Protein backbone atom coordinates (compact mmCIF):
# COMPACT_ATOMS: atom_id res chain seq x y z
CA UNK A 1 0.00 0.00 0.00
CA UNK A 2 1.36 3.40 -1.00
CA UNK A 3 1.99 5.99 1.69
CA UNK A 4 -0.60 8.76 1.47
CA UNK A 5 0.99 12.18 2.00
CA UNK A 6 -0.68 15.45 2.92
CA UNK A 7 0.45 16.86 -0.45
CA UNK A 8 -1.38 14.04 -2.29
CA UNK A 9 -4.55 14.74 -0.29
CA UNK A 10 -4.26 18.48 -0.94
CA UNK A 11 -3.77 17.98 -4.68
CA UNK A 12 -6.77 15.64 -4.94
CA UNK A 13 -8.86 18.05 -2.90
CA UNK A 14 -7.97 20.94 -5.23
CA UNK A 15 -8.94 18.86 -8.27
CA UNK A 16 -12.23 17.56 -6.91
CA UNK A 17 -13.42 20.04 -4.25
CA UNK A 18 -14.19 17.02 -2.07
CA UNK A 19 -13.62 17.06 1.69
CA UNK A 20 -10.15 16.37 3.08
CA UNK A 21 -11.13 13.11 4.79
CA UNK A 22 -12.98 11.93 1.67
CA UNK A 23 -9.85 12.61 -0.41
CA UNK A 24 -7.67 10.73 2.07
CA UNK A 25 -10.05 7.76 2.10
CA UNK A 26 -10.25 7.76 -1.72
CA UNK A 27 -6.45 7.68 -2.00
CA UNK A 28 -6.27 4.87 0.57
CA UNK A 29 -8.95 2.87 -1.25
CA UNK A 30 -7.14 3.36 -4.58
CA UNK A 31 -3.63 2.68 -3.26
CA UNK A 32 -2.46 6.24 -3.92
CA UNK A 33 -3.53 6.29 -7.60
CA UNK A 34 -4.89 9.81 -8.12
CA UNK A 35 -6.85 9.05 -11.31
CA UNK A 36 -8.62 6.11 -9.65
CA UNK A 37 -9.24 8.25 -6.55
CA UNK A 38 -10.95 10.89 -8.70
CA UNK A 39 -13.21 8.18 -10.16
CA UNK A 40 -13.86 6.79 -6.68
CA UNK A 41 -14.92 10.25 -5.46
CA UNK A 42 -17.11 10.77 -8.53
CA UNK A 43 -18.85 7.47 -7.87
CA UNK A 44 -19.36 8.51 -4.26
CA UNK A 45 -20.66 11.85 -5.50
CA UNK A 46 -23.10 10.14 -7.80
CA UNK A 47 -24.48 8.17 -4.87
CA UNK A 48 -24.80 11.46 -2.96
CA UNK A 49 -26.73 12.86 -5.92
CA UNK A 50 -29.05 9.84 -5.94
CA UNK A 51 -29.75 10.26 -2.20
CA UNK A 52 -30.68 13.90 -2.74
CA UNK A 53 -32.90 13.29 -5.79
CA UNK A 54 -36.14 13.20 -3.76
CA UNK A 55 -35.56 16.56 -2.07
CA UNK A 56 -37.75 19.46 -3.19
CA UNK A 57 -36.11 22.13 -5.32
CA UNK A 58 -38.04 25.36 -4.82
CA UNK A 59 -35.19 27.89 -5.10
CA UNK A 60 -32.86 28.59 -8.00
CA UNK A 61 -32.39 31.04 -10.82
CA UNK A 62 -33.03 31.70 -14.47
CA UNK A 63 -29.79 31.45 -16.42
CA UNK A 64 -29.52 33.14 -19.79
CA UNK A 65 -27.20 33.33 -22.76
CA UNK A 66 -27.22 35.46 -25.90
CA UNK A 67 -24.91 34.25 -28.68
CA UNK A 68 -22.31 36.76 -29.87
CA UNK A 69 -24.09 37.16 -33.21
CA UNK A 70 -27.23 38.25 -31.36
CA UNK A 71 -29.39 35.74 -33.25
CA UNK A 72 -29.71 32.96 -30.66
CA UNK A 73 -30.88 33.40 -27.07
CA UNK A 74 -31.60 30.93 -24.28
CA UNK A 75 -33.26 30.99 -20.87
CA UNK A 76 -32.95 28.00 -18.54
CA UNK A 77 -34.60 27.39 -15.16
CA UNK A 78 -32.09 25.80 -12.77
CA UNK A 79 -33.58 24.76 -9.43
CA UNK A 80 -31.99 23.97 -6.06
CA UNK A 81 -33.06 23.59 -2.43
CA UNK A 82 -31.86 26.87 -0.88
CA UNK A 83 -31.27 30.47 -1.92
CA UNK A 84 -27.75 30.14 -0.46
CA UNK A 85 -26.81 27.64 -3.19
CA UNK A 86 -28.70 29.68 -5.82
CA UNK A 87 -26.24 32.54 -5.15
CA UNK A 88 -23.18 30.25 -5.25
CA UNK A 89 -20.69 30.95 -8.06
CA UNK A 90 -20.52 27.29 -9.10
CA UNK A 91 -24.34 27.13 -9.37
CA UNK A 92 -24.42 30.35 -11.41
CA UNK A 93 -21.66 28.98 -13.67
CA UNK A 94 -23.65 25.75 -14.15
CA UNK A 95 -26.69 27.78 -15.27
CA UNK A 96 -24.51 29.70 -17.75
CA UNK A 97 -22.97 26.47 -19.11
CA UNK A 98 -26.41 24.89 -19.52
CA UNK A 99 -27.68 27.94 -21.40
CA UNK A 100 -24.65 27.85 -23.72
CA UNK A 101 -25.16 24.10 -24.24
CA UNK A 102 -28.80 24.66 -25.22
CA UNK A 103 -27.83 27.48 -27.60
CA UNK A 104 -25.25 25.25 -29.31
CA UNK A 105 -27.14 21.95 -29.47
CA UNK A 106 -30.85 22.87 -29.56
CA UNK A 107 -32.18 19.93 -27.47
CA UNK A 108 -35.86 19.00 -27.59
CA UNK A 109 -36.30 18.20 -23.88
CA UNK A 110 -34.50 18.06 -20.54
CA UNK A 111 -34.62 14.25 -20.42
CA UNK A 112 -36.32 11.23 -22.03
CA UNK A 113 -39.56 11.89 -20.12
CA UNK A 114 -39.95 15.24 -21.87
CA UNK A 115 -39.74 13.88 -25.41
CA UNK A 116 -43.12 13.57 -27.12
CA UNK A 117 -44.16 9.90 -27.41
CA UNK A 118 -45.48 10.47 -30.96
CA UNK A 119 -42.07 11.80 -32.01
CA UNK A 120 -40.39 8.66 -30.63
CA UNK A 121 -42.88 6.40 -32.43
CA UNK A 122 -42.22 8.23 -35.72
CA UNK A 123 -38.46 7.83 -35.19
CA UNK A 124 -38.94 4.12 -34.36
CA UNK A 125 -40.91 3.63 -37.58
CA UNK A 126 -38.21 5.36 -39.65
CA UNK A 127 -35.41 3.29 -38.08
CA UNK A 128 -37.44 0.07 -38.46
CA UNK A 129 -38.13 0.73 -42.17
CA UNK A 130 -34.48 1.64 -42.77
CA UNK A 131 -33.25 -1.58 -41.11
CA UNK A 132 -35.71 -3.72 -43.07
CA UNK A 133 -34.78 -1.95 -46.33
CA UNK A 134 -31.12 -2.77 -45.65
CA UNK A 135 -32.11 -6.44 -45.47
CA UNK A 136 -31.53 -6.89 -41.73
CA UNK A 137 -33.11 -10.04 -40.24
CA UNK A 138 -36.46 -9.44 -38.54
CA UNK A 139 -35.20 -10.87 -35.23
CA UNK A 140 -32.50 -8.18 -34.83
CA UNK A 141 -34.43 -5.21 -36.22
CA UNK A 142 -35.87 -4.33 -32.78
CA UNK A 143 -32.38 -4.32 -31.24
CA UNK A 144 -31.19 -2.04 -34.02
CA UNK A 145 -34.19 0.25 -33.47
CA UNK A 146 -33.61 0.33 -29.68
CA UNK A 147 -29.96 1.26 -30.23
CA UNK A 148 -30.93 3.99 -32.69
CA UNK A 149 -33.47 5.41 -30.23
CA UNK A 150 -30.84 5.50 -27.45
CA UNK A 151 -28.56 7.40 -29.81
CA UNK A 152 -31.44 9.73 -30.70
CA UNK A 153 -32.05 10.48 -26.99
CA UNK A 154 -28.36 11.45 -26.67
CA UNK A 155 -28.89 14.00 -29.42
CA UNK A 156 -32.20 15.53 -28.29
CA UNK A 157 -32.19 15.22 -24.46
CA UNK A 158 -30.17 17.91 -22.67
CA UNK A 159 -29.04 15.66 -19.80
CA UNK A 160 -27.77 12.96 -22.18
CA UNK A 161 -25.78 15.27 -24.49
CA UNK A 162 -21.97 15.45 -24.40
CA UNK A 163 -20.92 18.71 -22.71
CA UNK A 164 -19.71 21.17 -25.37
CA UNK A 165 -16.73 22.22 -23.25
CA UNK A 166 -15.65 18.66 -22.34
CA UNK A 167 -17.10 15.90 -24.52
CA UNK A 168 -15.86 13.22 -22.10
CA UNK A 169 -18.75 14.28 -19.82
CA UNK A 170 -22.46 14.35 -20.45
CA UNK A 171 -24.61 17.10 -18.95
CA UNK A 172 -26.02 14.66 -16.36
CA UNK A 173 -22.43 14.14 -15.08
CA UNK A 174 -21.92 17.90 -14.88
CA UNK A 175 -25.13 18.22 -12.87
CA UNK A 176 -24.22 15.31 -10.56
CA UNK A 177 -20.72 16.70 -9.97
CA UNK A 178 -22.26 20.02 -8.89
CA UNK A 179 -24.77 18.21 -6.63
CA UNK A 180 -21.89 16.33 -4.99
CA UNK A 181 -19.86 19.50 -4.49
CA UNK A 182 -22.67 21.75 -3.23
CA UNK A 183 -24.50 19.05 -1.26
CA UNK A 184 -27.98 19.87 -2.54
CA UNK A 185 -30.36 18.47 -5.10
CA UNK A 186 -30.25 20.47 -8.34
CA UNK A 187 -32.65 20.02 -11.24
CA UNK A 188 -33.19 21.60 -14.64
CA UNK A 189 -36.78 22.82 -14.66
CA UNK A 190 -37.31 23.92 -18.23
CA UNK A 191 -35.66 25.92 -20.96
CA UNK A 192 -36.53 28.08 -23.92
CA UNK A 193 -34.35 28.69 -26.97
CA UNK A 194 -34.99 31.53 -29.39
CA UNK A 195 -33.44 31.79 -32.85
CA UNK A 196 -33.99 34.72 -35.16
CA UNK A 197 -35.83 33.62 -38.28
CA UNK A 198 -36.57 30.10 -37.01
UniProtKB/Swiss-Prot annotation:
Q: The organism sits in which domain of life?
A: Bacteria
Cellular compartments annotated: Cytoplasm
Q: Where is this region: Involved in Mg(2+) ion dislocation from EF-Tu?
A: 82-85
Q: What keywords would UniProt list here?
A: Cytoplasm, Elongation factor, Protein biosynthesis
Show the InterPro entries listed in the entry: EF-Ts_dimer_sf (IPR036402), Transl_elong_EFTs/EF1B (IPR001816), Transl_elong_EFTs/EF1B_dimer (IPR014039), Transl_elong_Ts_CS (IPR018101), UBA-like_sf (IPR009060)
Query: Its GO CC terms?
Result: cytoplasm
The GO molecular function terms of this record are:
translation elongation factor activity
Q: Mind telling me which Gene3D superfamilies this protein's record contains?
A: 1.10.286.20, DNA helicase RuvA subunit, C-terminal domain, Elongation factor Ts, dimerisation domain
What the entry lists under PROSITE patterns is as follows: EF_TS_2
| Pfam families, per database record | EF_TS
**Function per UniProt:** Associates with the EF-Tu.GDP complex and induces the exchange of GDP to GTP. It remains bound to the aminoacyl-tRNA.EF-Tu.GTP complex up to the GTP hydrolysis stage on the ribosome.
Q: Which family does it belong to?
A: Belongs to the EF-Ts family.
Q: What is this protein called?
A: Elongation factor Ts
